[in-house]
Amino acid sequence: MEQPKYKRVVLKLSGEALAGKQGFGIQPAVIQSIAKQVKEVAELDVEIAIVVGGGNIWRGKTGSEMGMDRATADYMGMLATVMNALALQDSLEQLGVETRVQTSIEMRQVAEPYIRRRAIRHLEKKRVVIFAAGTGNPYFSTDTTAALRAAEIEADVILMAKNNVDGVYSADPNIDASAVKYDELSYLDVIQQGLGVMDSTASSLCMDNNIPLIVFSITEEGNIKRAVLGENIGTIVRGK
């Protein structure tokens, strides 16, 4: 068996990653592809926690820009992440991967409430755990959720899967042809240069808790496994 570099990981999936090229909603073929990649990693005896975004269904920021109360808009975004989590759980379980969804806002009919010790126990039993509903608080992004949960469960790394870029660039490569891709960065670089990898709250949490971050493309099948094995893909962010 191939030897993974990381034994416990947090996979951060944006909502857009689940929408695929259609850009909105959940594309079944995409979510099935992601589920297969997660199964590949689980078969290496790696403990996997997943944090899902909700931008494919609703963005709190968009709602607040339309004049909606920011907290209300953010709570709607949290509910969107639960929909994504349940869809991903279903795809994983169809492949025979035991999966649990834990939500930061209680909704016991559909998922467990987030309890740190229970989440760790699930991981130790080699179940995939999907964290939904963000942190349960408005004004915090799902990137911050990923950083927070990674610190809480003592994950070795955060794997940030993107569907429109294959790493961190000096500018948006989809707009600026002269954008330069970075192989390695520090969190201070990310914060000071405003590189848009994750928001400053999430970056600070990762930096303070010394959690490395790998940014890579989800569109190429097998990339999650490559990242876990320590292959040189995407961009790695670490340290100060």
Swiss-Prot record:
Organism, scientific name: Geobacillus thermodenitrificans (strain NG80-2)
NCBIfam families registered for this protein in UniProt: pyrH_bact (TIGR02075)
CDD domains (UniProt xref): AAK_UMPK-PyrH-Ec (cd04254)
Record PANTHER family: URIDYLATE KINASE (PTHR42833), URIDYLATE KINASE PUMPKIN, CHLOROPLASTIC (PTHR42833:SF4)
Domain of life: Bacteria
Similarity field: Belongs to the UMP kinase family.
Gene: pyrH
EC nos: 2.7.4.22
InterPro entries assigned to the protein according to its UniProt record, in alphabetical order: AceGlu_kinase-like_sf (IPR036393), Asp/Glu/Uridylate_kinase (IPR001048), Uridylate_kinase (IPR011817), Uridylate_kinase_bac (IPR015963)
Assembly with partners or alone: Homohexamer.
Gene3D superfamilies: Acetylglutamate kinase-like (3.40.1160.10)
A molecular function GO annotation: ATP binding
Name recorded for this polypeptide: Uridylate kinase
Positions of ATP binding: K12, L13, S14, G15, G55, R59, N163, Y169, D172
Keywords tagged on the record: Allosteric enzyme, ATP-binding, Cytoplasm, Kinase, Nucleotide-binding, Pyrimidine biosynthesis, Transferase
Stretches for region Involved in allosteric activation by GTP: 20-25
